[in-house]
Amino acid sequence: MPRLYLGKIPYNARERDVERFLKGYGKINNISMKYGFAFVDFEDSRDAEDACHDLDGKTMEGSSMRLVVEMARGKPRGNDRHGSRSPRRRSRSPRRRSRTPPRRRSRSRDRKRSRRSRSRSSSRSRSPVRESRRRSESRSPSPKRDLKREASRSRSPLPAKDRSRTRSGSPPKNGGDRKRSVSRGRSHSRDGSNRSVSRSPSPGSPKD
């Protein structure tokens, strides 16, 4: 069945307006109105060709837009708001997906990957041991530091309490010397008195 495509039809147009526009070009079997275009099925292909040849570029009553009239190709699909030409059928050939067999991995690659994974796991397992050693070494004081601390403690002056104790416990040097001189003077005086007593004659002794 021959079909005619009418494009750029006014949006407010109806089937009656299309019939008036195509009046005198044969018998019309069906009119399918869309938004901005229409498809008209003629009974005779000659009538459709004559209408396409004569009415292309002419205006419809009540509109200043020139219509597009041409032979339709296929059934209409969707709405054409801008009044473009009839959409063409796109042949959608089914795409054949070539199923390629999965590639076989060589054994050498698998071995290399297994070695890498083993080396990574071993390095990860060894790393916490090294960190614990480093922490223990950093926390444990070195012998050199202990010697320096002992030397600084021995050189550091005594606190105020220790000084007072040492001062109160040790007798002054001048006082000791004075006591010694006094004791020596007393001993000398005692010896002299004894000697004088022994030398002086007793009152009862006869004189020479």
UniProtKB/Swiss-Prot annotation:
It comes from the Eukaryota. Residues 84-123 have a biased composition (Basic residues). Residues 128-153 have a biased composition (Basic and acidic residues). GO terms for cellular component: nuclear speck; nucleus. The keyword Cell membrane does not apply. It is found in: Nucleus. Residues 71-208 are annotated as: Disordered. Residues 2-74 form the RRM domain. Keywords: Differentiation, mRNA processing, mRNA splicing, Nucleus, Phosphoprotein, RNA-binding, Sexual differentiation. GO terms for molecular function: mRNA binding; RNA binding. InterPro entries: Nucleotide-bd_a/b_plait_sf, RBD_domain_sf, RRM_dom, SRSF. One of its GO terms (biological process) is sex differentiation. Extensively phosphorylated on serine residues in the RS domain. Plays a functionally redundant role in shifting germ cell sexual differentiation in hermaphrodites. RNA-mediated interference (RNAi) of rsp-5/rsp-6 resulted in fertile animals that exhibit excessive sperm and delayed oocyte production, and sterile animals that develop morphological abnormalities of somatic gonads. Belongs to the splicing factor SR family. PANTHER family: SERINE/ARGININE RICH SPLICING FACTOR. This is Probable splicing factor, arginine/serine-rich 5.
